[in-house]
């Protein structure tokens, strides 16, 4: 008699089924709490598509005299993303060394460093921009500081996790021969973590290009401010062209 071998163990199947049931119940409860009704989207779908096809499409170009200003705002957005990420990465690297219990000269302080970075990371760049408006005013300075804070907090946690993956044997062997803290960093941490650091750095640049657009819409400068001005002026076809330009960055 042939016996069928289940592809998923019974215990795992029960866990998955229970998880799906919990997620379904949570969806129903949260939808009821927020009064979310998918039928409203379906009923208003025709009006939505009319708005897109009549106001946004086809995309249009602004006046020739304004095109250089748009490209200049795009350059400002890219510069904000690059500069804020670069400054944040340099600061995050040094702070992450103290946030890793494996290499930190003050292991007890590592959890406080990670906790502080987590606190900063949980506050979105848009919120930081609103907080900084009162002291710095509207401009690219606000966008730079807001992006720098969120990027710094994100990369501190990312760099700490990357450092934690370094082999403990490598660090201990350098300690055994009397290597100082800077020597351990230069000989063990950097060679082992450089690729990981670069990956997180490039990822953060990509995220900040999008974030700088959002921050710019509330006064942080760059292409976001230009986009918001066209939306506010009900020039949706030109705004859609700028949206496509942002998507291409």
Residues of each region from the PLM?
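Cytoplasmic-entry segments and transmembrane alpha-helices of multi-pass inner-membrane transporters
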Residues: 95-128
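Generic hydrophobic transmembrane alpha-helix motif, especially the helices
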Residues: 117-151
